[in-house]
Amino acid sequence: MDKLIIKGGKKLIGEVSVSGSKNAALPIFVSTILAPGLNEIRNVPFLRDINTTIKVLESLGAVVEGNGNIVRIDTTHVNNVEATYDLVKTMRASVLVLGPLLARHGRARVSLPGGCAIGARPINLHLKGLAALGADIRLEHGYVEAKAKKLKGARINFDISTVGGTEQLMMAAALAKGETVLENAAREPEIIDLAEILIKMGAKIDGAGTDTIRITGVKELAPVAHDVMPDRIEAGTFMVAAAITGGDIKIRNMKLEHLDALVFKLQDAGVEITNRDNVVRVKGPRRPKAVNIKTRPYPGFPTDMQAQFMALMCVADGASVISENIFENRFMHVSELLRFGADITVEGSTATVKGVKKLSGAPVMATDLRASASLILAGLAADNTTEISRIYHLDRGYESIEKKLAGLGADIQRVKE
């Protein structure tokens, strides 16, 4: 197993380029099931979750070839409708194959998913929505079994904003008979990216990016080529890396408008952010100011940036209050940040962070994907050496992050334990 060794205290200086978005790429890959033939997906990041998705698609009958950041997916012979536990258990997004398989073949058998250990993340909203489209849904022996001769459009109001649920039903409804209206739909940029490839394929979708999405079903979809959007969470992580080290970096291949809530909070903390010719410059202060945050569905502050922002607040001047309103059990990084000398107290879904002048390097252990990033950030800012173990979480969502940080002057290396 690999671990990261970081010798902290260096300001990050230079330029870095953001990879394609994992959270956009996964549903885009799955959407190719709906369009039999050869689809080409570009700007694909090299990540463990991408490889898992490829294995799921191959198990269903797809032929997948990769060349650099371009992946070609031939879904002509996707005739198997079962995604087994061995494949699905490692990644929650695998459950997204349910809707497309149901829409294309009229049946699907998909194992209940695994993935990050962040609360329950129930898929009941997916299943409730598919049932509203006319599917017969049963849970048997850890599998979701779904059947429908032909899905039919319906009006579906989500109890809570759900990114996966919105993606699932947008794909399923693309081939349903009649109009489907998704109310209280998720508004994330990744939803828009998925809608864009579906529209290229021939789907009729209006309102992606708003809380009401209308999908008029069509008889068939055709294969296409598509570029995955930049990863806004990776971009945000680099922004915080510049801020926490007092650095000065330029970030390419990012869309700043996807991170408005984070940008406002970083600016409140004293970080200078400018956008010129689609290159974002981030200049960290001598010491950040304490700022309160509350995670919200997009366009609010992203839950996937909460852990990284907490690391920044650990060295801020003053006390900050961080409220996690999206996922339960998403403060697992706190116990590890305390090992750096951070001053954090947790009560329910709220953490109070009293900034200290300096963190001290320590041996720590990653617990999930974004927690891994927060520990790297703390290590970059800390005195002495930090060792981070269990970094396999990191490889699920960040493409060569240690190489990119080293390119900005960080003293960071991956070694075998």
UniProtKB/Swiss-Prot annotation:
Location of the protein in the cell: Cytoplasm
Binding site for phosphoenolpyruvate: 22-23
Name of a matching Pfam family: EPSP_synthase
Keywords tagged on the record: Cell cycle, Cell division, Cell shape, Cell wall biogenesis/degradation, Cytoplasm, Peptidoglycan synthesis, Pyruvate, Transferase
Xref: CDD domains: UdpNAET
Catalytic activities: phosphoenolpyruvate + UDP-N-acetyl-alpha-D-glucosamine = UDP-N-acetyl-3-O-(1-carboxyvinyl)-alpha-D-glucosamine + phosphate
Organism superkingdom: Bacteria
Modified-residue entries (2-(S-cysteinyl)pyruvic acid O-phosphothioketal), positions: 116
GO annotation (BP), single: UDP-N-acetylgalactosamine biosynthetic process
One cellular component term from this protein's GO annotations in UniProt: cytoplasm
Main location class: cytoplasm
EC number: 2.5.1.7
Binding positions (UDP-N-acetyl-alpha-D-glucosamine): 92, 304, 326
This protein's pathway: Cell wall biogenesis; peptidoglycan biosynthesis
S-S bridge residues: none
Gene3D superfamilies, A to Z: Enolpyruvate transferase domain (3.65.10.10)
Molecular function as annotated in GO: UDP-N-acetylglucosamine 1-carboxyvinyltransferase activity
Active site: 116
Biological role stated in the UniProt entry: Cell wall formation. Adds enolpyruvyl to UDP-N-acetylglucosamine.
Family: Belongs to the EPSP synthase family. MurA subfamily.
Name of this chain's protein: UDP-N-acetylglucosamine 1-carboxyvinyltransferase
Native source species: Geobacter sulfurreducens (strain ATCC 51573 / DSM 12127 / PCA)
Gene from which this protein is expressed: murA
